[in-house]
Amino acid sequence: MSGRPLAAVARPLLLLPLVLFTMTALAPSASAHPLGNFTVNSFSGLRVEPQAVNVDLVVDSAEIPTVQQFPQADSPGGVTAEQAADYAARECNALRPGLRLTLDGTREELTVRSSDLQFLPGQAGLSIMRLSCELRTIGTVDTVGKDLEYVDENSLDRLGWREITATGDGVALVDSDAAARSISGRLTEYPQDLLTSPLDQRSASMRVAPGDGTV
């Protein structure tokens, strides 16, 4: 059995009804997350090089998931820089296995190169959090002349925005079904006309060819 105190485990659950009541009461005058207070939204930006693939992963969590994870985020003292850095490192490593990258059907493992966690103002005086993970394939990986497939298997049970982009850096991406530019600004500016029907792209495929750019 875990040695974590029962009160520490139960606190987020006990706070949730109060949080929901506060958000409902203040909703008309507060700025809510554009996709809803329960959403967990993700963006993967692929940058393909001749001998490596980089993944820029961003996870944007709305107010409810944030307060469940960090009930102290909006209390005096809040979340310390050390706590934020520790969570970011652990969470990026936990998400890494769910990012499936293959070249000609062979899976290429990713390693986390950097991680960051930021808290931003949300609705009713609560925070939302933005997790950023920079990942890269391990060692030298020849990409040219191969079919690349990428699948984000994380958060399959969550509501939210899912977006993947892909660009070539010293290579050309042929028949890519991923856009070259993020239409949400990496989850910072969601298009108003898509708020009721969020983008739900969890996979991308393309052919890597000699050149530079997307064909």
Predicted regions, residues:
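Generic N-terminal leader/targeting and pre-domain segments
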Residues: 3, 16, 28-30
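Intrinsic disorder/low-complexity segments
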Residues: 8-11, 26-31
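N-terminal soluble domains immediately following signal/targeting peptides that reside
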Residues: 29-215
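N-terminal secretory signal peptides that target proteins for export/translocation
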Residues: 1-9
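Bacterial N-terminal signal peptides
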Residues: 12-25
